[in-house]
Amino acid sequence: MGAHKFKTVNIRGKQYVEVKERVKYFRAEPKYDNWTIATEFPVLDSEQAVCKATIADPEQRVVATGHAHEVQANGNINKTSYIENCETSAVGRALAMMGIGVDDSMASAGEVADAIHQQENMPKVKAKPKAKANIMDSAVGY
């Protein structure tokens, strides 16, 4: 695994290995012959999805798991593909837990891009005025 050079994408100066590259490596690497990736959705409705990806060896021993949560209303991709996005993220995390395609971070490129976008577009929250001390605070000297 150490000798393999993964294709990466640059996001804000950091290199990230996309899930498709991790999956291609996992499927092509002879040491993972007869291993499985299985996914399940403990939560799946019209608004959100939670996916669990499990990687098992040929004896069906669980080697790694990964979880993801996506909300249908979040972002352009999720409006039509939140289930697929959720499953891909969970699989990427499970492969990352095995050390496949991990250098600096286990977040997928999409997760990093989404996080940056959300941070940049968060509404500004006004600071609340300091609350007046209530009678109990005054009684104990706060």
Language-model features: locations:
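Polyanion-binding surfaces on beta-sheet-dominated domains and ring/shell assemblies
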Residues: 1-142
